[in-house]
Amino acid sequence: MPPTREELVSTALNFIAQFAKLDVDSVLSFLSPNCTLRSFPSSLGKPALQTKEESKADFQGLKDFFQNFQLRVKDGSEPVVDEPARRVVLHIEGKGDSLVGRFETEYIYILRMNEEGTMVEDFFQFADSATRDAWGKKIEAHFSARN
């Protein structure tokens, strides 16, 4: 039996909750063995992560960089669910303290679940480009100053 809307939303929200904790193993437990993570827009130049090991390194980098990290569905937005395609679209707010100061941004996450609706098979992340560009410069300056 295909997953229900409620099951798909539950998996998506649980994934976001674990992502916000930056508990790498918990985040990875929600990813199917063949999960692909993609960041958009393409102009950000971030390659797709094709394996759990690549994803693990990426999530570990976030954990090392952020403190008090928060991810949540933006107030006033509701998940958009395509049950036959097993997709959930979320408007996410991200906040936290980092090595280079306070971080606040928005994302659109498109999560496609496995046939059971229990794991993420594809994770598409659309980032706020203006914030990402500004942060890229701050991060670059931070690490340049350390070298």
From Swiss-Prot:
Belongs to the trt14 isomerase family. Part of the gene cluster that mediates the biosynthesis of calidodehydroaustin, a fungal meroterpenoid. The first step of the pathway is the synthesis of 3,5-dimethylorsellinic acid by the polyketide synthase ausA. 3,5-dimethylorsellinic acid is then prenylated by the polyprenyl transferase ausN. Further epoxidation by the FAD-dependent monooxygenase ausM and cyclization by the probable terpene cyclase ausL lead to the formation of protoaustinoid A. It comes from the Eukaryota. In A.calidoustus, the austinoid gene cluster lies on a contiguous DNA region, while clusters from E.nidulans and P.brasilianum are split in their respective genomes. Genetic rearrangements provoked variability among the clusters and E.nidulans produces the least number of austionoid derivatives with the end products austinol and dehydroaustinol, while P.brasilianum can produce until acetoxydehydroaustin, and A.calidoustus produces the highest number of identified derivatives. GO terms for biological process: terpenoid biosynthetic process. PANTHER family: AUSTINOID BIOSYNTHESIS CLUSTERS PROTEIN F-RELATED, AUSTINOL SYNTHESIS PROTEIN F-RELATED. This is Austinoid biosynthesis cluster protein H. InterPro entries: Fungal_Meroterpenoid_Isomerase, NTF2-like_dom_sf. The lineage of its organism: Eukaryota, Fungi, Dikarya, Ascomycota, Pezizomycotina. It comes from Aspergillus calidoustus. Homodimer.
